[in-house]
UniProtKB/Swiss-Prot annotation:
The organism's taxonomic lineage, starting at the top: Bacteria, Pseudomonadati, Pseudomonadota, Alphaproteobacteria, Rickettsiales
Protein purpose: This protein is one of the early assembly proteins of the 50S ribosomal subunit, although it is not seen to bind rRNA by itself. It is important during the early stages of 50S assembly.
Residue ranges, compositional bias (Low complexity): 144-158
Protein name in UniProt: Large ribosomal subunit protein uL13
InterPro entries from the UniProt entry: Ribosomal_uL13, Ribosomal_uL13_bac-type, Ribosomal_uL13_sf
Signal peptide: none
Gene3D superfamilies xrefs: Ribosomal protein L13
Naturally occurring in which organism (per UniProt): Anaplasma phagocytophilum (strain HZ)
Length: 158
């Protein structure tokens, strides 16, 4: 029996909608990275972009465990001498960049190569409940119901 290898024409991509309200960022990002890579499919092929497209809504209401909302620090560099910038998740939320929290977490779980960059383009994150992908008919996934640890707050473990 020969080893199965997926061809480019055989890839079947679907759209997945995930509501990030009161969800823990790390667990959510790990699950999104798995979907983007396609590891949840039986026909997973490591060198192909066989993952699904993911739409995340309500990114502004994600949660961190413990005190990470104020203690965790994201660093970036402008490229100029002395240009090291830092901000906390609280700063990002107050400045209106809630999408970046999820995007950075998922990006760091995907890897560094050209295939990871192509897979990352299949992620769409919105801070509110509205998204512009109704024409793609995304399938809603209830991430909070998969495990009690996935969420914090009132609707955790629905």
């Amino acid at each position: 029996m020969r080893t199965f290898s997926l061809k480019a024409g055989e890839i079947d991509k679907r759209w997945v909608l995930i509501d990030a309200s009161d969800m823990v960022v790390g667990r959510l990002a790990a699950y999104i990275a798995t979907i983007l890579r396609g590891k949840h499919k039986p026909e997973y092929t490591p060198h192909m972009d066989c993952g699904d497209n993911v739409v995340v809504v309500n990114a502004s209401s994600v949660k961190f465990t413990r005190n990470k909302m104020r203690d965790k620090v994201y660093y970036r560099h402008t490229g100029y001498p002395g240009g090291l910038k830092s901000c906390t998740p609280n700063d990002m939320l107050r400045a209106g960049y809630a999408e970046r929290i999820i995007k950075v977490a998922v990006w760091r779980m995907l890897g560094d190569g050209p295939l990871a960059r192509r897979r990352f383009k299949n992620l769409k994150v919105y801070s509110g409940p509205e998204h512009g992908h109704h024409a793609q008919k995304p399938v809603a996934l209830d991430f909070g119901a998969m495990n009690n640890k996935n969420g914090r707050g009132n609707n955790a473990g629905r």
